[in-house]
Amino acid sequence: MRYLVRISFLEALMFPKPKPALTPNTYAYESEPMVKPTGFREYDARWLLGSEINLMGVQALGMGLGTLIHELGVKPEIVTAHDFRSYSASVKMALVSGLMAAGCKVHDIGLAITPMAYFAQFDLDVPCVAMVTASHNDNGWTGVKMGANRPLTFGPDEMTRLKDIVLNARFEPRAGGAFNFIADFPERYIADLTKRPKLKRRLKVVAACGNGTAGAFAPRVLEAVGCEVIPLDCELDHTFPRYNPNTEDMKMLHAMRDEVLRTKADVGLGFDGDGDRCGVVDNEGDEIFADKVGVMLARDISAQHRGAIFVADVKSTGLFMTDPVLKQNGAKTEYWKTGHSYIKRRLNEIGAVAGFEKSGHFFFNKPIGRGYDDGLIFALAVCDMLERNPTKTMADLKNALPKTWGSPTMSPHCADEVKYKVVDAVLKHFQDLQRRGGKVAGQEIRDLVTVNGVRVTVADGTWGLVRASSNKPELAVVVESPVSEARMREMFKAVDAVLRTHPEVGEYNQTI
């Protein structure tokens, strides 16, 4: 046995340095690791499988992650899991082989949604996590969400170090690697979510999963707490035949709308590909952007926890600062960088009760959650909010908010290699304009928020945001006005005009 372990050490020590590109269907592609450097994002990793990373590259990633875990001085034990795509299990096992070569004990929970892997860190008392998922990205993408300090996930510092270890083959192979499969782990997760009183209000809920991973779990959880569940595209099918399971995708939201209206449901709840995000359609079939649902939940939570602190990402509505009910409840909200790792970290740093992202990530600290994002915990929070308002519909609660006109997240293509330079140039443009007393959409600049890209707010409260996507070769553009739809469109026109001065910026995935 000692001899066999020693051989594995030598093999690991000789593991080749990853190449940034290799040609598929060649000897080199099957004999060397390939890892495109741009796949290391701000707080997780994403690649197109085959053209940007191969399985040997994933092995290198696992060895690098294991090396980093030892560097951080954390107990070298890690939860692994994978989402429902045709290739995710293979990617995970390549990752596992690298982790084991680096001396990590792997606790694999199999097919899972991302929050189930986060829960496993607590339930199994394991400090680290590696969830193989491309989240809401289209088929062809793969990636890994990682953490070594529950409930937090990696941020830029850890990702920068991991990138250096992997791309420069700074691996440190160790003894002690092992693999342990945890059978039937989803039952433990579902039991944890449902060990609570059943709802007294009988809610009819459309559960939409886009044929993604959440389809195996979301209907069961909602039924267990007393909902009448109408499943929509909950059969697992990794070809995603109807639409990509993405809660910001208008195709998914429109399918939810149609089913809510057809069945006269109280609410539609849609889950993304790895179950850490959730989108909402009200009983009248209107899609409610996640940031507006966040304001509704903040009202509900702050009524029970006066003076509650919340975190919202910079893409979110201005109502978190101006809503009279939140002010009356003594609630405070801090705008922070977009990204699940950033919001999670800030939530825990300032002791916020909950955090909200326009993309549909919702984070709950005690007494609601454990500090991580979980689409199912959010779904239960929506059901609880409806129960606490027995005479109100979801539409009633939405219509009680001050009126604003806002856009979805609009994403023009921009290559990973240049997107941050473009955003820096846009930021400088608005800073220079503010110094000169210039106008945007016909009004003077009242405020610039630069914590993540640039959010420019003018005198009447209308604002526009430009930031770089952390997950795709895209920018993210959002606009909102508390005045009128026309003012919202004027702001978009003004922001887009600045972007069009940069030829690197391509077509949008959707516009208003």
Predicted regions and their residues:
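Glycine-rich phosphate-binding loops at beta-strand->alpha-helix junctions
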Residues: D83-V91, C209-A216, S316
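Glycine-rich phosphate-binding loop
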Residues: V126-W141, V260-D282, E287, A331-D374
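N-terminal small/polar loop signature for handling phosphorylated ligands or for N-terminal nucleophile
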Residues: T67, K75-W141, R220-V281
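Phosphate-binding and adjacent anionic-ligand microenvironments
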Residues: H305-V478, V483-I512
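Gly/Ser/Thr-enriched, mixed-charge loops and adjacent short helices
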Residues: M34, T142-T263
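An N-terminal, well-structured beta->alpha segment
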Residues: F15-S97, A101-A102, I182-V205
